[in-house]
Swiss-Prot record:
UniProt-annotated stretches for the region Catalytic: 1-741
Catalytic subdomain A: region residues: 147-240
Residues covered by region (Cyclic di-GMP binding domain): 742-1550
Lineage: superkingdom: Bacteria
Functional note: Bifunctional protein comprised of a catalytic subunit and a regulatory subunit. The catalytic subunit of cellulose synthase polymerizes uridine 5'-diphosphate glucose to cellulose in a processive way. The thick cellulosic mats generated by this enzyme probably provide a specialized protective environment to the bacterium. The regulatory subunit binds bis-(3'-5') cyclic diguanylic acid (c-di-GMP).
The protein's name: Cellulose synthase 1
Outcome (variant: residue 372 to A): Loss of activity
GO biological process, one term: UDP-alpha-D-glucose metabolic process
Compartmental location: Cell inner membrane
Domain (PilZ) ranges: 572-647
Region of interest (Disordered), residue spans: 708-731, 768-813
Species of provenance: Novacetimonas hansenii (Komagataeibacter hansenii)
């Protein structure tokens, strides 16, 4: 057997080392799996658009580099690379762009997504089919013709003209094969006598069956029963074979007995409608070349060659085994091949055109043929799906699946074309992405898909022409697709007419009217977009959206116009098509003398064009003979020369008999090399191809004289071209004309309304409010504020405009103000005067009241051990000059008790200071000071009038005089007297410790400090430390009983004990004593307070029993929100905190804490369910009123107070299929991860509007208006994982992370100097208080060690507190940071090396580019004079552990650092790995190496590793591509070798 080679076999091998690795058993599988995992990892990670552009750019560069040198391996690489880019696009589409706000948007967006999924599926299936074309070569036949098999040649016909069929029959009779072993049969389903006569004349067999059931398949099956050849060769009646057909194809059938089918290409020597009708069509490959030049050759590699109904040899045994040709569908050919392959038969494809046929002459016929193909393939898909059933390999299943699903293109194509109209007409944004994101993801996907297809298809199909082909047929196929999928038995076989003539060109409306309608609609959408871009007042987002969708519409319109241009049928008067051919000929006279020699230019059944020089002037048609030699056989053909000149002669044949006709057919069609140039088109160049498509549109706009009114062609009729899918043409014309009129009218109305809208004002300015006095303390009320006591809703009390006694307050003169100060100074020692501004009491700023927000208030507390003896409210501010004293006022109340009334003076808008005396009996522990604004006449107020307002300055004062009450020393009152929850201010708790500062005593003190931190929470607490009892005030004394100060009397205890005793120096002060007989008992006593499971006794003494404390789990701090299930708002705050009153009820806040190391896959948002009930009553406009939702001062969403279902919902409610809108609304809301950090607060602002603005309404209606959230509203963090990149001091500033991962700090040790001073110990206690406030849990697990014993806690996180005098001891602990402390200075000691910087720049090029001009910040700061530094770095003792160092030369610096941690405003500035605090100034730095703490599931590591790292995505993705290509190329080569080896084995057996 001769050697059979494929391009796969000839491909150059892998490099030597890769070849050796792959040759190891199992190595290919391992490398392939690793490469696939890398590829999946790279495709699963999305990047911000600007980073994705880097990936896109590099992939494009790689595409050009690899594609520059074509080879099999480079093609495979480009396909895998395209898969990588497309899968990244798909991941981005599925995870980033599916955000729909309306049902219409969701429907349209889902339709587009499904269309894209279909397109991607077809892209990958096409790559699979064409990854390794087999390029099968002919095999020689046995040398002895006696061994050649017998062949029956079938030429089925139904209604075609004899002039067409006779060419095929005569050509078949001329095939080189032993005459006794071949028989030509005319299968005439038309049962026409002239065909029978022709068969008898030429020597062919004539077969006509009595009935026509099952169309072509039935005809063939009938002929099988009347013939007996070993093989069956089938030609459609217009396919004229070459003489070498059997000799080139039969070798494979003889050599391999498993081959049931040998298919060859269908080549058409006449142009198809696209080539003929489009201006650039003549230089464009025929539509079918892609299938026969690329796809079928690729199918052959997978043993999945399809039977195409003609130009194919079939083994009779195989056909009979399946019961004949398939008749269940209208595409008997593909279904027949599928049936044979299910039984184990193989199929083969020889990519050599051995027959030529006629293409469809007119577009309407072409569409009709494709309709039949689509119906048939979809019928097979439904009734004999290749994915199911037995007998097929996965390669065969996928190839057949690709062929069948390719005919589903109609619906996706229409969706792609019309999608921009969703925004241009309806304002529905169906892809939730910015134009930059689309540029970064979608354009590379399309570039690689087009570019790779161009490399694969070469000159077989030009880029962008598939879009024209599909668009031309899409709207016709939509109905066919849907009907066939739903009812696969519908439809019948339709014969495609061939050989018609067109006397004159015309515009075929019946073939393009759907696209004309679509084009008009698209033009209307484009016009709308251009109009809005030109004249609309658009913001940046809307402008980009219009620009993007207009560009999309423009591209769609160009494709549609190109498809419409195909409908301009060109004139076709030639009976015979010219075929280019270069054949030496001699022109002779009748006597045989040679007149001239020449070479043919083209041939046809009508004549020939010959390059020659005619020796004399031609006076008229002259009879001649043209003589040539073909394959050793001389042909002499009679002709007449009718024109000669310019080196060219035109001849027509003068055929008188069948033999002469046979000779002409042999010359024109029968040459073995007749069609070898069928694929000689220039290689595809996508940009030139796009230009050709655009130029083809120009054909639509030729001069009107070229447009001929619709007329029927001479022959044939298109009566059955579309069967049941084509209506009466005249009706189509009427529909088209009516549609054009309707679209034109709509366009006119749209333009008129748009113009009217453009000429009208876009907005009406609201009436300007009355001028307010300029004052820095009068800011406007924000729409959404964080929850503060100053912005909280006031109480429901509503004092009248004129209260009892009607005290209106008196202006406070300057001497009166001085008297207040003097009075405060002369107060007796037992009384204390407190002066608070409203800002001190918690007001966020000046208090402004309007009609919609008439009631504002402030909450404040009075210590429970103090008694108010007198009070005075001193107010200043301003009131609108539009207010009238007889109807308008501001009334003040304290705890709903009347204080006084402010009346406006229109001539003097500002007022104050004005003094109001307050009865001290009004005061309680928790107080509310309310300001109630009356904005109208008595009993009626215009609450919507923005010109009516009143403002109370934040500098107004409340002066309170108090006296101390006798102390009550009861442990049950703890944390009083040290902290009173009603007094919302920073707390100071003195600590008295033995000067030796024993670690166990310090641990006990730390437990108590953290407990106080829990009690004070965000207010903060400071612990001044001393070794002596203070002379006055309260304090906590901690120590072993025998070591307590002698001045205290050293109380006798029998174990751990807690006592409250009077201060020896201050009878009104209390000393809390925490003691025991030894240090362990002191710790137990501290735990007795911190972990008390029951209320402490109402006594001053308590003996403490040992406390059992369960080990803590990670992230289970009581202050942290649960993360394993949705958490109710009602579990975070009381129900009263979720309620508000009035049209503007203020901000409702839901605070919570959460670990800051949260991470979600691809930054998926957390889920929140907001539930609220729409208020009852008719005084509120609930459709215009809304609820604004935010988190940490970041706006999230707004919801109207009325639940709406839209138009469809209203219809469903009307027919009883949906429930009416209820009062309770439930909304699901996404919370972006970047808005969440340790200390968080949800904000809800009800902005209610009255039903009728500007109308006098009852003033009581406002305050009786109740709004609120349902406590069953939830927020869910269960999708979060814990991992973080360190160092990051921002985590420490919010909730003490990473130390508070365990609430009791059991994984933390505090490193103090060997002999700490009081300032250092105080800093330690303040820090423990901060930790307790962060976790609401005492730090019972923390250890205290010195630097010399730090190795004992090497596996823990370390908190280092040190002064400069002891900084040398802790220097080794900061060895992994970039800083050192020396000579009282903090300095930078190391920067990243040049190599490190290069690696960082490659890893994150965008950041490196942005920071290209910045230099590393060198730190050289003296840590003296109150300057403190906080440094965070990885522990040198254990990887993944953290060291946090607080350093300063004195206590003031340490105290400054800790105060900074407790201030919310400064926390935002704490970040990086170093913070330096100097007074109010704070500086952050980031220099130290990063490290990672936490764990993730395996599937999340790619996202974590490559998130925001485009270079890593590229490296991992390209590594995956290289590995997969290496394995795939080797596997494909071995697969091809196995196919040919099987053939050789079969031959040896035979």
């Amino acid at each position: 057997m001769p050697e059979v080679r494929s391009s796969t076999q000839s491909e150059s091998g892998m490099s030597q080392w890769m070849g050796k690795i792959l040759s190891i058993r199992g190595a290919g599988l391992i490398i392939g799996v690793f490469g696939l995992c890398a590829l999946i990892a790279a495709t699963s990670v999305t990047l911000p658009p600007e980073q994705q552009l880097i990936v896109a750019f590099v992939c494009v560069v790689i595409f050009f580099i690899v594609g520059h040198k074509p080879s099999r391996r480079s093609q495979i690489f480009l396909e895998v690379l395209s898969g990588l880019v497309s899968l990244r696009y798909l991941t981005w589409r599925l995870t980033e762009t599916l955000s729909f706000d309306t049902w219409l948007q969701g429907l349209l967006g889902t339709m587009l997504l499904v269309a894209e999924l279909y397109a991607l599926m077809m892209l990958f299936l096409s790559y699979f089919q064409t990854i390794a074309p087999l390029h099968r070569a002919p095999l020689p036949l046995p040398p002895n013709p006696d061994e050649w098999p017998t062949v029956d040649i079938f030429v089925p016909t139904y209604n075609e003209e004899l002039s067409i069929v006779r060419l095929t029959v005569l050509g078949s009779l001329g095939i080189d094969w032993p005459p006794e072993k071949v028989r030509v049969h005319i299968l005439d389903d038309g049962r026409r006598p002239e065909f029978a006569a022709f068969a008898a004349e030429c020597g062919a067999n004539y077969i006509a069956r009595p009935t026509n059931e099952h169309a072509k398949a039935g005809n063939l099956n009938y002929a099988i029963g009347h013939t007996d050849g070993d093989y069956i060769l089938i030609f459609d009646c217009d396919h004229v074979p070459t003489r070498a057909f059997l000799q080139l194809t039969m070798g494979w059938m003889v050599e391999d007995p498993k081959i049931a089918l040998m298919q060859t290409p269908h080549h058409f020597y006449s142009p198809d409608p696209f080539q003929r009708n489009l201006s650039a069509g003549y230089r464009t490959p025929p539509e079918g070349n892609l299938f026969y030049g690329v796809v079928q050759d690729g199918n052959d590699f997978w043993d999945a060659t399809f039977f195409c109904g003609s130009c194919a040899i079939l083994r009779r045994t195989a056909i009979e085994q399946i019961g004949g040709f398939a008749t269940q569908t209208v595409t008997e050919d593909a279904h027949t091949a599928l049936k044979m392959q299910r039984l184990g038969w193989s199929t083969a494809y020889l990519r050599i055109p051995l027959a030529g046929g006629l293409a469809t002459e007119r577009l309407i016929l072409h569409i009709g043929q494709r309709v039949r193909w689509a119906r048939g393939m979809l019928q097979i898909f439904r009734i004999d799906n290749p994915l199911f059933g037995r007998g097929l390999s996965w390669g065969q299943r996928l190839c057949y699946l690709s062929a069948m699903t390719s005919f589903l293109f109609a619906v996706p194509r229409v969706i792609f074309l019309s999608s921009p109209l969703a925004f241009l007409f309806f304002g529905q944004n169906i892809i939730a992405a910015s134009p930059l994101a689309l540029l970064a993801y979608a354009i590379p996907h399309m570039f690689h898909a087009v570019g790779t297809a161009s490399k694969i298809n070469k000159g077989w199909r030009y880029s962008f022409w598939s879009e024209v082909y599909e668009t031309t047929m899409a709207l016709f196929l939509v109905r066919v697709t849907i009907v066939t999928l739903l009812s696969p038995s519908r439809g019948k076989f339709n014969v495609t007419d061939k050989g018609g003539l067109l006397e004159k060109g015309y515009f075929d409306l019946g073939a393009v009217y759907p696209n004309i309608i679509l084009g008009l609609i698209m033009f209307g959408g484009l016009a709308r977009g251009v109009y809005e871009l030109s004249f609309g007042h658009l913001d940046q987002i809307a402008e980009r959206a219009y620009l993007l969708n207009s560009a999309w519409a423009m591209l769609s319109l160009i494709i549609i116009l190109a498809a419409i241009a195909v409908g301009r049928e060109t004139q076709q008067k030639r009976n015979s098509h010219r075929i280019p051919a270069t054949i030496p000929v001699e022109v002779a006279n009748a006597d045989g003398s040679i007149i001239v020699t020449g070479v043919t230019e083209d041939l046809s059944m009508g004549g020939a064009a010959v390059k020659m020089s005619w020796p004399a002037k031609l006076s008229g048609p002259t009879p001649v003979y043209i003589r040539t030699v073909l394959d050793g056989e001389e042909l002499i053909l009679p002709a007449r020369i009718i024109r000669a000149g310019n080196g060219r002669g035109i001849f027509i044949w003068t055929i008188d008999n069948l033999q002469q006709e046979f000779s002409v057919i042999r010359l024109v069609f029968g040459r073995a090399d007749a069609w070898v140039d069928w694929g000689n088109y220039k290689a595809d160049r996508p940009l030139l191809s796009l230009m050709d498509m655009v130029l083809s549109v120009k054909g639509l706009f030729r001069s009107s004289g070229d447009i001929v009114h619709r007329s029927s062609p001479t022959k044939p009729s298109a009566g059955n071209a579309l069967s049941d899918d084509t209506n009466n043409p005249s009706r189509k014309e009427r529909v088209l004309k009516g549609t054009v009129k309707m679209v034109s009218l709509l366009a006119l109305l749209t333009f008129a309304s748009s113009a009217q809208a453009a000429s009208a004002p876009r907005a009406v300015a609201a009436k300007a409010p009355a001028h307010q006095p300029e004052a820095s303390d009068l800011p406007p009320l924000p729409a959404l504020l964080p929850a503060t006591s100053g912005a909280a809703q006031a109480g429901s009390g509503d004092a009248g405009a004129d209260g009892p006694g009607s005290p209106t307050g008196q202006p406070l003169a300057a001497d009166s103000a001085d008297a207040l100060v003097e009075n405060a100074e002369n107060t007796s020692d037992t009384a204390t005067v407190h002066n608070y501004t409203l800002k001190d009491l918690g007001a966020a700023g000046s208090i402004t009241m309007r009609g919609l927000a008439p009631l504002q208030g402030i909450e404040f507390g009075i210590p429970s051990d103090q008694l108010v003896t007198s009070a005075r409210l001193v107010l200043s501010g301003s009131m609108s000059p539009n207010l009238r004293p007889e109807t308008n006022s501001v009334t003040m109340t304290l705890n709903e008790q009347y204080i006084g009334t402010l009346r406006p003076d229109p001539a003097h808008p500002t007022f104050g200071p004005m003094s109001f005396e307050i009865n001290p009996i009004f005061f309680v522990s928790g107080n509310r000071l309310n300001f109630n604004f009356a904005s109208g006449s008595k009993g009626c107020s215009d609450i919507t009038n923005d010109t009516l307002w009143a403002t109370i300055s934040q500098n107004s004062q409340l002066q309170i005089t108090t006296i101390a009450l006798p102390p009550r020393r009861l442990l049950s009152r703890l944390p009083q007297p040290f902290y009173d929850k009603n007094v919302r201010q920073h707390v100071t708790v003195p600590m008295v410790l033995a000067q030796t500062y024993d670690p166990q005593i310090l641990k006990s003190a730390g437990i108590l400090a953290s407990w106080f931190g829990k009690q004070t929470d965000f207010l903060g607490v400071t612990f001044p430390v001393s070794s002596t009892i203070p002379q006055s005030g309260n304090a906590i004394l901690i120590g072993v009983a025998d070591e307590l100060p002698t001045s205290f009397g050293r109380p006798q205890v029998n174990g751990p004990a807690v006592l409250e005793l009077p201060n020896p120096s201050d009878a009104n002060a209390t000393i809390l004593v925490v003691t025991g007989r030894d240090r362990d008992e002191v710790i137990t006593a501290s735990k007795g307070i911190a972990f008390a499971s029951a209320p402490l006794p109402t006594d001053s003494h308590m003996d403490v029993a040992p406390v059992d404390i369960a080990p803590r789990k990670p992230n289970d701090a009581p202050s942290f929100i649960a993360m394993d299930h949705p958490v109710r708002f009602g579990d975070l705050v009381t129900a009263s905190k979720l309620q508000g009153t009035g049209f503007t009820s203020g901000v409702l806040s839901v605070p919570f804490r959460i670990p800051p190391d949260l991470y979600t896959w691809r930054n998926r948002p957390y889920k929140m369910q907001v539930r609220f009930r729409s208020p009852a009553g008719e005084a509120k406009d609930v459709e215009k009123s809304r609820l604004d939702v935010g988190i940490n001062e970041v706006y999230l969403h707004s919801y109207p107070l009325r639940e709406t279902h839209g138009l469809i919902g209203a219809v469903l409610q009307g027919v009883g299929l949906a429930r009416p809108a209820s009062g309770m609304q439930v909304h699901d809301l996404d919370v972006p991860p970047w808005t969440v950090f340790g200390q968080d607060q949800l904000n809800f602002y009800f902005d209610a509007m009255p039903l009728a603005r500007g109308i006098c309404q009852s003033g009581a209606a406002n305050n009786a208006f109740h709004l609120g959230l349902d406590p069953d509203s939830t927020i869910d963090f269960s999708r979060a994982h814990h991992i973080a990149q360190m160092p990051n001091l921002a985590y420490m500033a919010t909730v003490g992370f990473p130390f508070t991962t365990y609430a009791d700090l059991s994984q933390t040790a505090v490193v103090l100097p060997e002999h700490p001073n009081a300032a250092t110990v105080g800093a330690y206690l303040d820090l423990m208080g901060f930790m307790g406030a962060a976790t609401w849990y005492p730090v019972a697990g923390v250890d205290i060690v010195s630097a010399d014993h730090v190795s004992d806690v090497a596996d823990r996180n370390l908190l280092v507190i040190s002064t400069l005098a002891t900084s040398g001891e802790i220097a080794p602990l900061l060895s992994r940071s970039s800083y050192e402390v020396a000579d009282g200075h903090l300095r930078t000691v190391s920067h990243a090396s040049a190599l490190d910087n290069a690696i960082k720049a490659v890893d994150d090029p965008l950041t490196a580019f942005r920071d290209r001009d910045s230099k590393p910040q060198d730190v050289d700061t003296p840590l003296t004079g109150g300057v403190g530094a906080m440094i965070e770095a990885e522990s040198p003792l254990t990887a993944g552990r953290t060291v946090l160092a607080l350093l300063s030369s004195d206590g003031a610096g340490l105290n400054n650092l800790l105060q900074m941690l407790g201030e919310r405003k400064k926390q935002a500035n704490i970040q990086g790995d170093l913070v330096v605090a100097h007074g109010e100034d704070l500086s952050s730095y980031r220099t130290s190496p990063v490290y990672t703490i936490g764990t993730l599931p395996l599937w999340l590591w790619p996202d974590w590793y490559m998130h925001n790292r485009p270079v890593r995505v590229l490296l991992v993705g390209l590594l995956g591509c290289i590995l997969i290509v290496s394995v795939l190329a080797r596997a494909l080569a071995r697969h091809a070798a196995r196919r040919f080896k099987q053939l050789e084995d079969e031959r040896r057996k035979s």
